[in-house]
UniProtKB/Swiss-Prot annotation:
It comes from Salmonella agona (strain SL483). This is L-arabinose isomerase. Gene3D superfamilies: 3.40.50.10940. InterPro entries: Ara_Isoase_C (IPR024664), AraA_central (IPR055390), AraA_N (IPR055389), AraA_N_sf (IPR038583), Fuc/Ara_isomerase_C (IPR004216), Fucose_isomerase_N/cen_sf (IPR009015), Lara_isomerase (IPR003762). Its EC number is 5.3.1.4. NCBIfam families: PRK02929.1 (NF002795). GO terms for molecular function: L-arabinose isomerase activity; manganese ion binding. Homohexamer.
Length: 500
């Protein structure tokens, strides 16, 4: 079972009584056929539920009102099978607070050249019914997604499925609770921000709990639970000699297991699905949570270090969006560069907390080594390299008057040399279009040093995320040129200033 099983998407057909009962009967029949086919063959993440035809303002408004109050409804897919006068949709769309996708399709793929008549034309009017619907969306300044293509086309299936992921993630975000253990790293700017504005814009709440509250739960974990989790570690990872049963760091592994069990219990009891820690506030914990955080991220929790609640929330959102897709998604940080003409590289990592979902190794190494930051005992961590291939890094920043999502398309590559003295998980990548352009654009746009790294999601997914939440997006990819990028930032400043 996945999070998508908790939701459904309503399929709404727009028409009108002008065409008579027989035409409406055929419209309903077509809709039933299309919905059944999409549910059985399109591999959509959510079930489509066909609703009664929308043929009058009252019917349409009732559907939209019901959608708002149904917690299982993640959004609406609308198909204008015939012409549906768009003034009928005004009241419904004005109150709708769920995501909306217009499926611009028709029942037949090919025109029946020899038999086409006006009855056929009146029945299959998506071509101009869809345009009428599009006008009212533009007139009401309500942005919605549009997918054009025949309902049997696999590309259309893929695009609808991607939108469904966004719709479900938006509903999950409205319920998301972010727990901050301690505060931000002192004097750091980008990890701070307006939590009230974030809750108004996205729906997630951010609150702080004392590390002492967590420590109480951690200290309540019994040896039996710790032993069971250690057995799981033994079967899932390659333990270094120091961490094996008679190793001199075995107790550190047991303490890491205690912290993991305590953190998970605390998060479950509080209904949290994202959290932050900071190495400056660890009072009562024997080590910085490393292994615990890595494993919790792999289970779907959002996380970021140093109190960075925006990145923690973004990671949870992207984890939901990517559920069931190939490739992983992780907290990440641009750590250091490799400058080589024509082969500039970025080495990404963090002190400990990189999610194993992006690991190339089937069984990462579990080790305990010294960590100079934090002043605690040596922490346990998983060490691995990252899968290669196309990926993205994304940063959500608070500009005071709005949020900006910054996305850099990257290509992860194999590490050309072993890293025998690097005791943390890492990812190595080439930034698009090149490191100088990408880094300068990122800096000019105010992108954070913390990011969410993903092989599972792509730029199109993040564009949809920005659209569905109505926030600015700045993209750095192979098409980026700095003069145009700077102009776009200036234009966005004017646009969003006027939009306020």
């Amino acid at each position: 079972m996945t999070i998508f099983d908790n939701y459904e998407v309503w399929f709404v057909i727009g028409s009108q009584h002008l065409y008579g009962a027989e035409t409406l009967r055929q419209v309903t029949q077509h809709a039933e056929h299309v919905v059944n086919a999409l549910n059985t063959k399109a591999k959509l993440p959510c079930k489509l539920v066909l609703k009664p035809l929308g043929t009058s303002p009252d019917e349409i408004t009732a559907i939209c009102r019901d959608a708002n109050y149904d917690d299982r409804c993640a959004g609406l897919v609308v198909w204008l099978h015939t012409f549906s006068p768009a003034k009928m949709w005004i009241n419904g769309l004005s109150i709708l607070n769920k995501p909306l996708l217009q499926f611009h399709t028709q029942f037949n793929a090919a025109l029946p050249w020899d038999s086409i008549d006006m009855d056929f034309m009146n029945l299959n009017q998506t071509a101009h019914g869809g345009r009428e619907f599009g006008f009212i969306g533009a007139r009401m300044r309500q942005q919605h997604a549009v997918v054009t293509g025949h309902w049997q086309d696999k590309e259309a299936h893929t695009r609808i499925g991607a939108w469904m992921r966004q719709a479900v993630s938006k509903q999950d975000t409205r319920q998301l609770k972010v727990c901050r253990f301690g505060d931000n790293m002192r004097e750091v700017a980008v990890t701070d921000g307006d939590k009230v504005a974030a809750q108004i814009k996205f729906g997630f709440s951010v609150n702080t709990w004392a590390v002492g509250d967590l420590v109480q739960v951690v200290n309540s974990i019994g040896d039996g639970d710790i032993n069971a989790l250690i057995d799981e570690y033994e079967s899932s990872y390659t333990l270094t000699p120091a961490t094996q049963i008679h190793g001199d760091k075995r107790q550190n592994v047991r303490e890491a297991a205690r912290i993991e069990l305590g953190m998970k219990r605390f998060l479950e009891q509080g209904g949290f699905h994202a959290f932050t820690t900071t190495f400056e506030d660890l009072h009562g914990l024997k080590q910085l949570p490393g292994l615990a955080v890595q494993r919790l991220m792999q289970q779907g929790y959002g996380f970021a270090g140093e109190g960075d609640w925006k990145t923690a929330a973004l990671l949870r959102i992207m984890k939901v969006m990517s559920t069931g897709l190939q490739g992983g998604t992780s907290f990440m940080e641009d750590y250091t560069y490799h400058f080589e003409k024509g082969n500039d590289l970025v080495l990404g990592s963090h002190m400990l907390e990189v999610c194993p979902s992006i690991a190339v190794e089937e069984k990462p190494i579990l080790d305990v080594q010294h960590l100079g930051i934090g002043g605690k005992e040596d922490p346990a961590r998983l060490i691995f390299n990252t899968q290669t291939g196309p990926a993205i890094v994304a940063s959500l920043i608070d500009l005071g008057d709005r949020y900006r999502l910054l996305v850099n398309c990257i290509d992860t590559v194999k590490t050309p040399h072993s890293l025998p003295k690097l005791p943390v998980a890492n990812a190595l990548w080439k930034a698009q279009p090149d490191l100088p352009t990408a880094s300068e654009a990122w800096i000019l746009a105010g992108g954070a040093h913390h990011t969410v790294f993903s092989h599972a999601l792509d730029l199109n997914d993040m564009r949809q995320f920005a659209e569905i939440h109505d926030i600015e997006i700045a993209v750095i990819d192979n098409d980026t040129r700095l003069p145009a990028f700077k102009d776009a930032l200036r234009w966005n400043e004017v646009y969003y200033g006027l939009k306020r």
